Amino acid sequence: LTIMLILWHIIYIKFTLPLKSKKALKNDKADRCGLTNGVLTEKEQIQMTKDLNHKILDCTIRDGGLVNNWDFSVKMVQDMYAGLSEAGVEYMEVGYKNSAKLLKGADAGPWRFLNEDFLKEVIKTKTDTKLSALVDIGRVDENDILPREQSHLDMIRVATYIKDVDKALELVNKFNSYGYETSINIMALSHVMENELTEAFEDIAKSPVDVVYVVDSYGSMDNRDVDYMVTKFQNLLPNKKLGLHMHNNMQLAFANTLVGASKGVEFLDASVFGMGRAAGNCPTELLVSYLKNPRYEIRPVLDLIERHLIPMREKVEWGYIIPYMVAGVLNEHPRAGMALRSSADKDKYVEFYDKLTSPEAMPTNHHSD
């Protein structure tokens, strides 16, 4: 009997336990993604509910265009829409709806100045993934905007600096009357005074805008900053949905996005492989794989990276690079870092740091994407 018990114990340890451990690991991963019927704690249930309310807005084509002058092939944009749709991403920002007549850059790709007929030729059949475009104050011709029922676009986002919020809200009112979902994205928040923000919120609260964005234009915010900003927005704009647009200068875009998400921010901006101006954005593939929403699938996003983003990354540069880190730490626009990376001295980081921290350094010019 003793020998039989010993043999049974050996068999259990050698064969049965490893199988249970593998199954446990698999179930743990499934539970994290909300794919099993296991019993969840109250905290997990609350988090799952929040995750199900989140919406990912992928801005690869729009923000990534700042890297390659919007030189995306029709095939890539079609693949992006199909892939993001398969991945369960709720919105794809397909470019800017600015006017070439009001802005230099006629040599830019078509996603810089979206044309409705062209967009309908590229994306012939829409899916559940909605399409958005972004406009800048003073750069959009309102006559170019069709009523929503005549457009492929579902959402128009208005980017503005704090001084132009009144002009942004005029556009929001018009786009809202056309039937579009709308957002207002207040840029360079890390340079905005408290009283300016409070005054702007009074007008925003009375407007029909659907979503108000916390935008970390310079990639200078940390988790405490995001927590503070989101709380302020929630307190002063209780009836508005909130969004987050983070930059990755200090390797915090994903972490900061999760901070906002945990506080109930609904719209989360991201881009495939993090493609975006300078240090780039929160990677779509991270959000899709992390959020506990069974609608999200990581495989189609990995396919997009493999087929399109890897080859593109060999031609143009974005992501965490020291000059952009320095700009983020100093709460400065990355334009100086972008100029450095385009020069023969692109890796002279100490000289760059000394230049930006010298008393003669010019203050940040706010007018920029």
Feature map (PLM): residue ranges:
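Intrinsically disordered, low-complexity segments enriched in serine/threonine/proline/glycine
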Residues: 38-39, 43
